[in-house]
């Protein structure tokens, strides 16, 4: 029979969070085989893991997996309780294995993930084992997989700190455009990681939300204008509109007519109006879509060329390739967004863990 040393018992206890005597008994029953001892203690380990599930997991990592032919990409967020555990090698192995599992099975639902087999068991059981070994609550919070057909690609990017991940799918018409679209999608993913657009297009913004945001935005600009006025600096223009969704054909037609009347009043020759009006109308649209510039990917100015919006970048790339280029999918995960972490003092936290 193998010798059951104190060091072996300690190692098993650290792996499973089970009691000292339970660990010793498990090692005796399994003749000192620590892997079998972990299996022997699974139910006790699961009991410990269940207690850990009450604790908030708001740290962790965002992971991206992209197929070599850019036909498929997966994005997932796995949460732990502390940043320390998120840097643990065992946790990293869990993330890598889960990411590959999600990608290989093209999963977009955590419910489905928990029923998929890994290492000879359902993922839910595999996860509980890792919770017991690592010693913290771990949650696969959300997953998504994007798949494309011929004439489209999907690419992804995860920021070096593992806190932000983005997937973008682009559709094109000519096979020769593929490599350029792969590169463009990667660059746009990096833009989105930094600039935090919430949705792809203004069409996804709820009208009621826009109305509320307009009130808040105007109040913000008026407050800033008070300070600018005090400093003797130019004031912000207070917009009548803040989203492209508000710029109906009649609004744009009326604005164009207003611009022509202004040019007439200024004595500008009518022959040059058609050269001036488009630029002024474009400026009006830019000044009237402030919420789109903040919250929508297509409405934001590109970080690599701040003279163009992402929509204009796509249009320019399409002309360059003599093709039609369109973003068809956009997903962005930021670690812990929307998770409310409980406030707890140190003494309470220790008592909770002991109890």
Swiss-Prot record:
<keyword id="KW-0648">Protein biosynthesis</keyword>
<dbReference type="GO" id="GO:0005737">
    <property type="term" value="C:cytoplasm"/>
</dbReference>
<feature type="region of interest" description="Involved in Mg(2+) ion dislocation from EF-Tu">
    <location>
        <begin position="82"/>
        <end position="85"/>
    </location>
</feature>
<dbReference type="InterPro" id="IPR036402">
    <property type="entry name" value="EF-Ts_dimer_sf"/>
</dbReference>
<dbReference type="Pfam" id="PF00889">
    <property type="entry name" value="EF_TS"/>
</dbReference>
<dbReference type="InterPro" id="IPR018101">
    <property type="entry name" value="Transl_elong_Ts_CS"/>
</dbReference>
<dbReference type="InterPro" id="IPR001816">
    <property type="entry name" value="Transl_elong_EFTs/EF1B"/>
</dbReference>
<dbReference type="InterPro" id="IPR009060">
    <property type="entry name" value="UBA-like_sf"/>
</dbReference>
<dbReference type="GO" id="GO:0003746">
    <property type="term" value="F:translation elongation factor activity"/>
</dbReference>
<comment type="similarity">
    <text>Belongs to the EF-Ts family.</text>
</comment>
<keyword id="KW-0251">Elongation factor</keyword>
<protein>
    <recommendedName>
        <fullName>Elongation factor Ts</fullName>
    </recommendedName>
</protein>
<dbReference type="InterPro" id="IPR014039">
    <property type="entry name" value="Transl_elong_EFTs/EF1B_dimer"/>
</dbReference>
<keyword id="KW-0963">Cytoplasm</keyword>
<comment type="function">
    <text>Associates with the EF-Tu.GDP complex and induces the exchange of GDP to GTP. It remains bound to the aminoacyl-tRNA.EF-Tu.GTP complex up to the GTP hydrolysis stage on the ribosome.</text>
</comment>
